[in-house]
């Protein structure tokens, strides 16, 4: 308990420093025309190049995460479910490295990018106009793939027609049992729902006010650690109240405000963004990988939430790594990007939606039923599974994009 008291005290001091002292950090002067010297402001006619690079890389990182899951699953599917087991030290290290250190920022990066581009809303945009525009883009492909993941596995014996029909009852309320990765769509939808509500505040908020909210959000990311090591219920949680003290400052809303703060108020030089970004990413990512390695024990079945105690996307380490990664990407100040980067960026949503169709088959072939001795050494097997899946998805979405009405299937 003493160590957590020390951690909390240090975290409180850092929050104070972040709120009060950060104004003294050197910033770019605001030019007389009101635009930032960095290229992070939105314009109607110019794409933000580094955002395209984030989409391209983050999409691959998602597949790297799911490729890694094939090497610590304890159930018949081979994927990490409610329980996990590492078969040897090699799996322990490389899963921690790829899934934890390298790829854990993938989901928060997508959230930050969404908020970075959409907040605050364009002048004159109404709530219903915003909802119509965003949901017409994401809901038809989402629903289409919910149905595809439900019925296509019947064709290759993944499950029976009866099981597929039963799963229809599930997808009315949640993601398909065959498509666990579609959980991401629900927090993305919730983020879109809240944007018109917080957008007016963000238009008027000062840098210090946004830092205050971000500091509260940072404190809320301690919750998974408190649940794991201190108490199951903290900050007012109990069986009749599931909303803790910082509930309304927590979750992906924090990444939304962070994205707006970076775009509007953080006018650091490229050199400073490079230095701070590198330090933050290395510190956060290293801890994320180490925490999995430390908790994992080869040959022992563990409850997955306990094994992944530091991997939740709203934890201090992942927040720190995401902030660092975003700063590093923002150092890409080119006005244009290669056509292939722009193209993959546009196709990335469809690639994400379909990737488990390919990844499951490729992983099954690569692992061969024995995660301890895959076709290639684990150090190579995990990135190879991810890369092959990525290429298959890229080719498929590119071909589908030529079809009339493809935007209703792949969003592009």
Predicted regions mapped to residue ranges:
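Membrane-cytosol interface segments of multi-pass membrane proteins
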Residues: 3-222, 369-412
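Helical transmembrane-bundle signal
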Residues: 62-65, 111-117, 146, 254, ...
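Aromatic-anchored segments of alpha-helical transmembrane domains
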Residues: 64, 216-228, 281-294, 357
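Central hydrophobic cores of alpha-helical transmembrane segments
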Residues: 210-220, 275-284, 345-348
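Structural signal for the C-terminal ends of transmembrane alpha-helices
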Residues: 118-125, 197-203, 258-268, 327-335
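Alpha-helical transmembrane segments of multi-pass integral membrane proteins
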Residues: 296-404
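Interfacial loop-to-helix transition and helix-capping segments at the boundaries
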Residues: 95-108, 172-187, 228-255, 288-323
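Membrane-helix interface motif
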Residues: 70-78, 154-161, 229-232, 292-300, ...
């Amino acid at each position: 308990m003493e160590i957590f008291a020390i951690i909390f005290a240090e975290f409180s001091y850092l929050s104070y420093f972040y709120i009060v002292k950060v104004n003294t950090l050197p910033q770019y002067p605001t030019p007389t025309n009101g635009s930032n010297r960095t290229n992070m402001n939105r314009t109607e006619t110019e794409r933000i190049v580094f955002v395209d690079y984030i989409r391209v890389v983050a999409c691959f990182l998602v597949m790297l995460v799911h490729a890694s899951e094939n090497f610590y699953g304890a159930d018949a599917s081979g994927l990490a479910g409610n329980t996990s087991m590492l078969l040897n030290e090699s799996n322990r290290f490389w899963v921690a490295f790829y899934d934890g250190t390298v790829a854990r920022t993938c989901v928060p990066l997508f959230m930050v990018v969404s908020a970075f581009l959409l907040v605050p809303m364009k002048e004159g945009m109404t709530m219903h106009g915003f909802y119509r525009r965003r949901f017409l883009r994401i809901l038809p492909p989402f629903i289409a793939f919910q149905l595809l993941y439900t019925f296509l596995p019947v064709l290759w014996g993944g499950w029976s027609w009866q099981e597929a029909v039963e799963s229809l009852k599930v997808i009315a309320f949640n993601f398909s049992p065959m498509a666990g990765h579609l959980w991401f769509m629900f927090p993305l939808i919730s983020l879109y729902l809240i944007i018109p509500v917080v957008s007016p505040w963000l238009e008027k908020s000062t840098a210090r006010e946004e830092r205050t909210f971000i500091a509260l959000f940072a404190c809320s990311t301690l919750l998974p650690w408190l649940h794991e090591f201190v108490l199951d219920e903290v900050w007012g949680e109990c069986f009749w109240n599931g909303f803790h003290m910082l509930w309304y400052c927590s979750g992906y809303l924090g990444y939304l405000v962070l994205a707006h703060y970076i775009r509007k108020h953080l006018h650091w030089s490229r050199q400073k963004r490079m230095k701070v970004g590198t330090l933050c990413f290395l510190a956060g990512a290293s801890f994320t990988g180490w925490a999995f390695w430390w908790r994992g024990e080869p040959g022992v079945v563990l409850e997955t939430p306990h094994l992944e105690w530091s991997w939740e996307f709203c934890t201090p380490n992942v927040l720190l790594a995401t902030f660092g990664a975003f700063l590093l990407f923002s150092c890409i100040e080119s006005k244009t990007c290669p056509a292939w980067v722009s193209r993959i960026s546009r196709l990335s949503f469809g690639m994400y939606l379909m990737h488990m169709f390919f990844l499951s088959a490729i992983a099954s072939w690569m692992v061969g039923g024995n995660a301890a001795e895959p076709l290639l050494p684990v150090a190579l097997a995990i990135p190879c599974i991810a890369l092959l899946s990525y290429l298959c998805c890229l080719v498929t979405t590119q071909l589908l994009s030529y079809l009339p009405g493809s935007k209703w299937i792949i969003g592009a």
